[in-house]
């Protein structure tokens, strides 16, 4: 944590697992950090950003913060597709906001869907482009060399290549838009920016889709 603050030129941070010490630092505007995520709900902050990507940790931290009447913004789609509706209700019950952050595919795609609907267009398909090769039998060991070359955690890269991340994000998009998945596992064809409208046309028009109003993804020069 200290190194992160130093790299950003923010000086020295107070690192502690003592709530009173952290709250004192917060009160004086001093950067503060902790190794115990489960005390965050006790800190004197208005908004908590949960970005672990770990469903269990995210669920515990987020629910505790909502119960403490703190707004929570998440970059944890893995948690959101699991218990997002429950957390949304908890937030409403406590008069605070629970929201998925802008920046990742589900929310950005949702914004485009809402824009199209505002203009009274029918949404045939919404989704994302996948810029990693689809290797469903990947393991952290098989992608380790590539991951280290990219300064990534092999487990994280594996979740990209084996399709886990894409499937999770598209479930989130389906949940929030009301669109259905095109089929179990989705089609995931190769495409490009110039050919997207042809690839995701209905089958009767030469595309892959058997019906409109679905979520899917593609690979290729689109991301």
Question: Model segments located where?
Answer:
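Rossmann-like NAD(P)H-binding beta-loop-alpha module
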Residues: 91-95, 99-165
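Rossmann-fold NAD(P)-binding glycine/threonine-rich loop
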Residues: 52-68, 75-104, 114-115
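Conserved active-site and cofactor/substrate-binding residues in soluble primary-metabolism enzymes
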Residues: 35, 43, 56, 60, ...
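C-terminal catalytic/substrate-binding lobe primarily of soluble NAD(P)-dependent oxidoreductases
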Residues: 145-223
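Generic secondary-structure signature for well-ordered alpha-helical cores
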Residues: 6, 10, 89-97, 114-122, ...
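N-terminal glycine-/serine-/threonine-rich beta1-alpha1-beta2 phosphate-ribose binding loop
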Residues: 1-64
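Glycine-enriched alpha-helix->loop->beta-strand junction motifs that scaffold or abut catalytic
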Residues: 44-45, 69-71
């Amino acid at each position: 944590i200290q190194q992160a603050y130093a790299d950003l030129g923010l000086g020295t941070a107070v690192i502690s697992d003592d709530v009173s010490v952290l709250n004192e630092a917060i009160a004086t505007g001093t950067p503060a950090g902790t190794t115990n995520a489960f005390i965050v709900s006790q800190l004197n902050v208005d908004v908590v950003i949960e970005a672990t990507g770990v469903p269990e940790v995210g669920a515990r931290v987020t629910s505790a913060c909502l119960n403490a009447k703190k707004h929570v913004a998440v970059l944890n789609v893995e948690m959101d597709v699991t218990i997002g509706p429950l957390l949304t209700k908890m937030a409403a019950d406590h008069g605070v906001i629970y929201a998925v952050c802008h920046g990742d595919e589900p929310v950005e795609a949702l914004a485009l869907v809402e824009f199209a609907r505002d203009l009274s267009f029918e949404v045939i398909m919404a989704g994302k482009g996948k810029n990693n090769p689809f290797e469903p039998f990947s393991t952290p060991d098989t992608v380790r060399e590539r991951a280290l070359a990219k300064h990534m955690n092999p487990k994280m890269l594996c979740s990209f290549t084996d399709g886990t991340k894409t499937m999770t994000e598209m479930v989130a998009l389906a949940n929030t838009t009301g669109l259905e998945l095109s089929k179990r596992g989705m089609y995931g064809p190769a495409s490009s920016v110039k050919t997207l409208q042809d690839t995701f046309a209905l089958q009767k028009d030469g595309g892959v889709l058997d019906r409109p109003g679905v979520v899917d993804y593609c690979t290729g020069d689109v991301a």
